[in-house]
Amino acid sequence: GDVLIDLVDIGAGTRGLDYIQCIPGGVPGEKHAPNLFTHVDRFLFVNLDGKRFIKEDARRDVLRDAMLDQPKAIAWTIVDADGFEQLKNSKGPENEVALKTGTLYYADSIEDLAKKIGVPANNLKEAVDTYNKGC
């Protein structure tokens, strides 16, 4: 931010600064953020109600707006065990740290995961079932 302002002050041009692009993953106050959204065909987003609210392959600006519209602007990224395994080569270290620090959760069932992340199990199950039918 500060360097950009200094560059503009000395004449640097800018473009596209009237919007932001964002993707999920950051946990406020945490140094190690889990990364589960590399492979769009392996994850889904749910809100604090456990409901899927967007197609995960949407453009970043559409994702941003949809996430910011959710309760408390929070969304969970849900990935199955196979998807998590696929990420080990590229994102394994970050995800392992996130598991240890409690910013990433592992569960043996949808009901267990719902309990860990504090969402209604029936909504999460419906979101996962609907997602799986579309794959």
Which positions does each model-derived feature cover?
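Gly/Ser/Thr-rich active-site loops/lids in small-molecule metabolic enzymes
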Residues: 1
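An anion/pyrophosphate-binding glycine-rich loop and adjacent beta-alpha core
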Residues: 4-119
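C-terminal catalytic domains of large/alpha subunits in multi-subunit enzymes
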Residues: 115, 119-135
